[in-house]
Amino acid sequence: MPSVIGTNESNIDFRNQVDFVLGDSHGRSCSPALTMMVEEIVSDMGYSVVRNSPYSGGFITRNYGKPADGIHALQIEIKRGLYMNEHNYTRNSGMSEIMQDMTYLTKHLVSLEPHALAA
């Protein structure tokens, strides 16, 4: 996501403040426990995290996430300025750290037992 994303309906200024936005269609596309787990892991890595604002999840998240059926869809938006120069679209020095952190998150998620994802 762009580093500057304006303000939301709550008049919270997101410019340069939010590193990650987790979109779970307000709890409808992903188990709240799974969203909370991702939020805690990302936050523990030192990033700022918000849920569903300004991005609550797009078409795929809304249409394919069915937590009651064991299908969880969580949109993860990452502030571009953390890993790239937004003017010329080249990697910056933060790319390696983001890659390591997302690898850690992914390994944690794929190691979960299905019952841990119950909606």
For each feature predicted by the language model, list its residue ranges.
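Catalytic cores of processing enzymes, dominated by hydrolases/peptidases
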Residues: 1-83
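His/Asp/Glu-rich mid-to-C-terminal helical/loop segments that flank catalytic regions of hydrolases
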Residues: 86-119
